[in-house]
């Protein structure tokens, strides 16, 4: 026996050493290089802790389809002309290419032409128009599917090439869904420059300027503005549409931007270009930065052999004409061709800074994106904010640990020390497991670790309370300890499984940081089972063998309790009904987009700033109102030197908003300097997707809990547990809605965590009710009251340990985790109440009603049987009696 215990201790010791070895690089930076290379690199910090950018890019598949059809349109004009077919190719609109066959008698030849040259196009039913036929061509479904896949793959490759040349350490680029790319850039120093580099399509085109057309564009634009055909702030597409009947059919209008050498200002002017693209960026072999005559940088472009040949031909055939160089729909320069240019070189000039010219060279070398990309989510965390989050997370975790250690020693004496040992072992193994698995530690992940600290001792509380009962029942010390572990085993398993169900839902439907929380919580729960059931048992086995433990000495609350919880059910149902009604109203309103939704669910921009001196919210609000930003939501945090500004709807990017906001405040408060330390931008599509995923995660976790509880106990217990869980989630949601607390992704995470955790107390109560129903006789209400009174102290204690750590998280964990902690604080209180006053009384009411219905049904059956017997007596005539005569 002693040898077995020693081997178990050795096993625990080896596990602890391995965990420390893997987590050591995260604690100290004084390790040799080979340690990180061959042993462990420690915990990987998420972007929210070490700073950086997290982007979700939406690839515009419609533009990819439009680009493909535009290429087909250009090829069709040339190929049809070679075949002698008279066709008019229109402009691509809504993924459709209109083509008119001038001579309807050539229909068969045209259809053969399409089949041979453009098999990927589908032609609709032709429409007759005065001797001609009008076709609408579109890509067939297979081609669209392949194009989408090809576009996403090419976009991913182009972005990877750009970022690699930009020089970011350990970037992450992964596909998400069918049209999105997730980009993570840890430690990026210039976020706006990185955004410009990533978002630039870099579509390079060469087109001829139509100087021969007798068109006065400035005059036409002025007239269109006067008549209202064109609105101020027009886009190029709107300009071409408004002046379509004033310019040649094969021309289109572009805007040229150039620097005025005399004034140094950037000027814009319209240019009329030929639609035909003579050369594209696909022919580029290299692009480098050079310095021009005016000491200004420009980009020198080298073409490949085919591009050099084409460029020489183009310049040779168009001497004395202007050749426009177009980048992403903007004319960068339009020089006059003086002579044929050989050697395959060209220059792109403009008002570039050295950094801008360098980045343009990067995107040209990496190649153009096959379609435009839109940034639908942008979360940027400065290194200062990340370091502050780590500091506050560690402070909250340390304080929470000390509070739990002190409480357990106070209440359970020496056994509390054993539970504290298991908790510390749990944290060490958890950090080691995260390092071993290469998991990324995020700020929500730190919250998961802190939450695990409180939950780590819950299992020991259940074991100790069972030990107390066994010991008070007169059993020997060893039998009491064995009974404590044996009888608490399935209760512990049930409570942990329900938490794991919600953690799985969070992992499946959460975003990156929330997935980190789910992984941390799952590992914490699994390791808690190991440390509570194995780690502490080894200690008690050792103490019993050595005869060092003589008795169990525990503090005890609520001695000889006899509270009529079932009798109070009607009052509890009224209170709970009001809370649930409030929660349902909140859920409906929030689902419709009303209420204080965070930018994750409403869309918009969130900017976090720090100031050198304290300021007042009213002063900031007045400044923003004067500048037309009165709709912005303002929150002051952390001692009056930090500011959060939220704009739910804005056409500007979060980078532009943050720069403008900082300039605005610094000019209005010259004695106080504001600096942007973090920013978020969520597009409408992402916010809607996150909202839907949150709802699905809640539904999935609830269904999983119902199924498990119904399987482990019986159906009515599953119903009671589910109603109690819904009650807890709705109550917290309703309170948040009532007091206008912002509903963020972390709050939803807290609600889902609460859904699993609040069942811990409910499972404890249900397990005792089931046990007493099997071994005791009496009325149902009396047995339920007895069961709840017996487990009341452990219910309150398990809630208290978690309450202490989330309280520390609320006060010391920083503003980001504050609402998460508040939701958990409310959830612990409401969950304790519901396990006592809601879940058990529901089981009582259901069983009582079922029994009443059963009795009533039996009475009805008996009455029907009596009625049937009476009817039978009436319809059945008695046999006639024989008359007896005397002889």
Where are these regions (language model features)?
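Cytosolic juxtamembrane regions of multi-pass inner-membrane proteins
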Residues: 454-497, 541-549, 741-798, 838, ...
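Hydrophobic alpha-helical transmembrane segments of membrane transport and translocation systems
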Residues: 425, 432-433, 469-579, 812-887
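Small-residue-enriched core segments of transmembrane alpha-helices in multipass membrane transport
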Residues: 11-19, 417-438, 449-456, 513, ...
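Non-transmembrane, solvent-exposed regions of membrane trafficking/translocation machinery
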Residues: 61-336, 688
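Pore- and gate-forming transmembrane helices of large, multi-pass membrane proteins
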Residues: 384-404, 455, 475-511, 564, ...
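Interfacial segments of transmembrane alpha-helices in multi-pass membrane proteins
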Residues: 2-6, 300, 306-324, 387-444, ...
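Hydrophobic alpha-helical transmembrane signal-anchor segments
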Residues: 1-53, 130, 566-590
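Extracytoplasmic
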Residues: 152-153, 158-165, 169-170, 251-381, ...
């Amino acid at each position: 026996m002693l040898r077995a215990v020693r081997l178990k201790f050795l096993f625990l010791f080896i596990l602890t050493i391995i965990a420390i070895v893997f987590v050591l690089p995260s604690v100290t930076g004084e390790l040799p290089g080979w340690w990180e290379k061959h042993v462990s690199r420690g915990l990987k910090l998420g972007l929210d802790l070490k700073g950086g950018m997290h982007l979700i890019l939406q690839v515009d598949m419609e533009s990819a389809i439009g680009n493909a059809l535009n290429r087909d349109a250009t090829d069709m004009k040339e190929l049809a002309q070679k075949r002698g077919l008279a066709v008019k190719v229109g402009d691509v609109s809504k993924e459709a290419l209109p083509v008119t066959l001038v001579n309807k008698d050539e229909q068969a030849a045209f259809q053969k032409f399409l089949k041979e040259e453009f098999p990927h196009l589908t032609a609709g039913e032709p429409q007759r128009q005065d001797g001609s036929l009008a076709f609408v061509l579109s890509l067939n479904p297979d081609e669209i599917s392949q194009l989408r896949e090809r576009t996403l793959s090419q976009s991913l490759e182009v972005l990877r090439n750009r970022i690699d040349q930009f020089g970011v350490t350990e970037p992450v680029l992964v596909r998400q869904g069918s049209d999105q790319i997730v980009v993570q850039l840890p430690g990026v120093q210039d976020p706006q420059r990185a955004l410009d580099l990533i978002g630039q399509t870099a579509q390079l085109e060469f087109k001829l300027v139509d100087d021969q057309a007798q068109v006065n564009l400035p005059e036409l634009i002025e007239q269109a503005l006067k008549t209202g055909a064109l609105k101020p702030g027009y886009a190029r597409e709107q300009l071409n549409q408004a002046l379509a009947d004033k310019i040649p059919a094969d021309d289109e209008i572009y805007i040229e931007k150039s620097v005025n050498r005399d004034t140094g200002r950037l000027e814009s002017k319209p240019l009329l270009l030929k639609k035909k693209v003579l050369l594209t960026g696909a022919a580029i072999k290299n692009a480098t930065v050079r310095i021009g005559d005016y000491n200004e940088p420009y980009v020198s472009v080298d073409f490949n052999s085919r591009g050099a040949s084409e460029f020489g031909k183009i310049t040779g055939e168009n001497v004395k004409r202007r050749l426009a160089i177009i980048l992403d729909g903007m004319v960068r320069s339009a020089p006059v061709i003086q002579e044929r240019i050989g050697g395959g070189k060209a220059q792109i000039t403009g008002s570039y800074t050295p950094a801008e010219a360098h980045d343009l060279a990067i995107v040209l070398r990496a190649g153009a994106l096959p379609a435009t990309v839109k940034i639908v989510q942008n979360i940027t965390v400065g290194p200062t904010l990340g370091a502050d989050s780590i500091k506050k997370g560690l402070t909250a975790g340390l304080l929470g640990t000390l509070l739990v250690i002190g409480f357990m020693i106070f209440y359970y004496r020496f056994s509390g020390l054993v539970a504290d040992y298991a908790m510390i072992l749990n944290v060490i193994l958890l950090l080691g497991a995260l390092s071993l698995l290469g998991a990324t530690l995020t700020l929500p992940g730190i919250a998961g670790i802190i939450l695990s600290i409180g939950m780590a001792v819950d299992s020991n509380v259940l074991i100790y309370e069972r030990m107390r009962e066994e010991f008070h029942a007169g059993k020997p010390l060893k039998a009491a300890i064995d009974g404590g572990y044996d009888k608490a085993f399935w209760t512990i398993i049930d409570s942990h499984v329900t938490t794991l169900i919600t953690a799985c839902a969070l992992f499946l439907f959460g975003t990156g940081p929330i997935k980190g929380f789910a992984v941390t919580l799952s590992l914490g729960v699994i390791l808690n089972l190991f440390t509570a059931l194995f780690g502490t048992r080894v200690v008690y086995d050792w103490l019993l063998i050595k005869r060092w433990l003589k008795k169990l000495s525990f503090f005890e609350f609520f001695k000889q309790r006899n509270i009529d919880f079932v009798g109070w059910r009607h009052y509890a149902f009224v209170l709970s009904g009001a809370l649930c009604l409030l929660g349902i109203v909140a859920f409906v309103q929030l689902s419709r987009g009303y209420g204080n939704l965070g930018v994750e669910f409403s869309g918009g921009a969130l900017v976090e700033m720090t100031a050198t001196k304290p300021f007042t919210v009213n002063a900031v609000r007045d400044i923003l109102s004067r500048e037309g930003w009165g709709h912005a939501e303002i929150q002051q945090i952390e001692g009056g030197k930090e500011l959060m500004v939220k704009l739910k709807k804005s056409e500007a990017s979060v980078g532009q908003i943050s720069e403008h906001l900082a300039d605005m405040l610094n000019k209005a408060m010259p004695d106080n300097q504001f600096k942007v330390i973090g920013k978020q931008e969520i597009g409408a599509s992402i916010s809607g997707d996150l909202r839907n995923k949150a709802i699905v995660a809640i539904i999935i976790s609830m269904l999983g809990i119902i199924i498990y509880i119904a399987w482990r106990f019986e159906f009515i217990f599953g119903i009671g547990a589910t109603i109690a869980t819904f009650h807890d989630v709705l109550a917290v949601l309703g309170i948040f809605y009532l007091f206008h607390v912002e509903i963020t992704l972390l709050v939803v995470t807290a609600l889902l965590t609460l859904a699993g955790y609040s069942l811990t107390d409910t499972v404890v109560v249900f397990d005792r009710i089931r046990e007493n129903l099997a071994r005791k006789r009496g009325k149902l209400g009396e047995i339920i009251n007895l069961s709840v009174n017996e487990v009341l102290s452990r219910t309150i204690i398990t809630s208290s340990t978690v309450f202490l750590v989330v309280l520390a998280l609320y006060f010391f964990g920083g503003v980001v985790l504050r609402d998460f902690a508040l939701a958990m604080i409310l959830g612990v209180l409401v969950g304790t109440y519901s396990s006592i006053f809601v879940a058990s009384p529901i089981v009582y009411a259901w069983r009582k009603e079922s029994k009443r219905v059963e009795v009533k049904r039996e009475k009805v059956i008996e009455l029907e049987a009596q009625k049937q017997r009476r009817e039978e007596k009436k319809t059945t005539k008695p046999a006639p009696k024989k008359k007896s005569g005397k002889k």
